[in-house]
Structures are given as structure tokens and as C-alpha cells.
């Protein structure tokens, strides 16, 4: 039985469209961090309120990922993905129309639901479009769109000189998804692997059986812990890196360039580490990845000036963002096709708890008067916990259809 899309044009179309959606998702996810200093001045936000604004969108990602993954196994990856893209496109434009802090928070929560619903389907479609031996590379190629979308957000932020022009970032981030919806409807093929198992008993399994039955309990828990801890670090950096760099004395242009370095490193890291996972022993790749995260965070905390901060941010992006792409690839191979959407969606949802905790923890430390290096260094112990969980995960047997 074919478990992947065999035709090369269909593979290329699937991966290209998934990359484009990830690019737009990355643009939206990092738009708040880029626009935050200007939004804070317009709405008169305190540090605590900025933390709430950061976490609002990521809070919506949790139910979105769980629901999007479950529906992917029931009604198909393509349908759920199109609905999710339309939702976050409309609500990104609504973000630009926000006239108060309360409205901003509500709109960002709803935007997060759309963003969260898209990711499990992007992972499933990318991993199922290629043979099993290439799944990590395919997921990484898709996921590198996230940091490259962040590069676009950073460049837009640098180009917009006025404090009142932050809304344009969200107009761009909303128009792109809405223009892409009809393209997806016409060109995106449904996963062949999903069509082969749709309606089977496995596809109708309960959520509890999908996650914990069939010997999957330990793999599920290890995935959840590694996702949760890694996303604490990732979303702390995504949301607070511009403000922390500004607090270190960098001007707006240099802050934007540090953010660009972080995202470019992330895109290259996703491609490189994903390809390595398909070709090398997983324990070496994962161990090296987490060692790189720890060392780059230490360098980012200690860097004295712009050049060293940019270099450290590049390395941090390479290992943190690249590492998250590896975790997404691992989730795709530890659940069988009929259950992949639910399993990946649950892991993404639990990880999103970390994406809420990370910005809020940074907010708490900064509000208590802690310096930027101390806040960055505080994420290193969390990284070590994620490393242990991920190394335990790869000792588990992979799923078989």
C-alpha cells in the first residue's frame, strides 16, 4: 500500500504550499514581538500587559492545535488546513483594527486558534507526502518557513519608521493567508496516506487510545515534556528578544538585525538538523542539538555588543528553532497515519502551554527587576529537561502502519 504521495509534482506542490503557509504563520507569530514597543506606546502598556498580549495568541494555539489535529484524522488534512488559514488571515487583519488593549487580547486569542489548527495539518501533510526515510527533511523544509516569516516581520518592522505604522505588519500578515485560500482549494492535494486509512477502525479510535494505547504512553509523555520545555525557550525568545535587545542599548535598526539573524539561523538550522536526522543516529543529532541550545543561550546572555549579540542570536535560532523542527518530525514518526493528526495535535497543544509560560515567566522576571542576561540564562535549566525527555523518546520504537 502506498503511504505517501508518489507523484513528484504532487510532492513538490504539497511541500511548497505547506512552506508558504508556514511562512505566513511565522510572520503572524512574530509580528506582535516586532510591533510590541510601538503598541506599548500607543496603548500605554506596562511590562505585565505586554506579557499578556504576547501570551494571548499563544494561549489560543492550544485549543486550536488539539481541535485541528483531531479533525484532521476525521475529515481530512486539507479541509482543516484551509479553514485554519482563512481564520488566522481574517483575525490578523482584525488585530490591525484593534482600538484597545482588551480588544487586542481577544483578537490575538482567536488568531491563535487558527494558527494552532494549521500546524498539525502542516506536519501531517509534509510527512505523508514523502517516503518514511525523508520525513524529517520534509517536515524541516516546511517548518523553516516559520523563521523566514519572522525575517519578513523583522524587516517590515525596520522599514516602518513611524510608531503608528505597526498596524501595517498585521495587514500584510492577514492579506497573504486570504489570498492563499483559493490557491489551496484548487492545488493542494489531500494526503494519499490519509485517504488510504480514512474511515478505518484506527481512524475512529478515541483520543485516549490514540495517545496512550498500543504502547504509545511513554512516547507521548516524552514528546509532551520535550515540546513543553523547548517551546518555553522558543516563545520567550520570539516574543521578548527585540525588547531585551533594546534594553541592552541597541537602536531600532540593530534590534531588527539581531531578530533577522535569529530567524535566518532558525531557517538554516531547521534544514540542516532535519536532514541530519534522516541520515545520522537520532541520539547524536538530538544530543548535539540541545548542547547547541545551551551554549548559544549562554553566549546570548554574555555577549557584550551588537556583533556578538547578532552572532549569538544566529546560533540560538539555529538550534532552538531548528530543534523544534526536529521535535515536530519526531512526532510525525511516532504515531501511525490514522492517528497522526490527533497525536501531533496533542503534542503541539501541550507544547503551546510552554509557549504561554515562556513569555509570562520572562515578564515576571523583568517586572522583578532582573537584567536581560539573567532572564536569558534562566532558560538553560529548562533546556536540559527537554533534552533528557527527547533522548528518552528516541529510544522508543517508531510507529508502523
Protein language model annotation of sequence segments:
Residues 1-27:
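Cytosolic juxtamembrane N-terminal segment immediately preceding the first transmembrane helix
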Residues 33, 215-270:
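Extracytoplasmic gate region of multi-pass secondary transporters
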Residues 44, 76, 97-103, 131, ...:
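Helix-breaking motifs and short loop linkers at transmembrane-helix boundaries and internal kinks
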Residues 63-101:
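Conserved MFS/SLC helix-loop-helix module at the cytosolic interface between two early adjacent transmembrane helices
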Residues 74-84, 279-290:
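Cytoplasmic membrane-interface "Motif A"-like loop-to-helix N-cap segments
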Residues 87, 91, 102-110, 307-315:
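Paired small-residue
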Residues 107-144:
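Cytoplasmic helix-loop-helix junction between adjacent transmembrane helices
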Residues 142-186:
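Helix-loop-helix hairpin linking two adjacent transmembrane segments in secondary transporters
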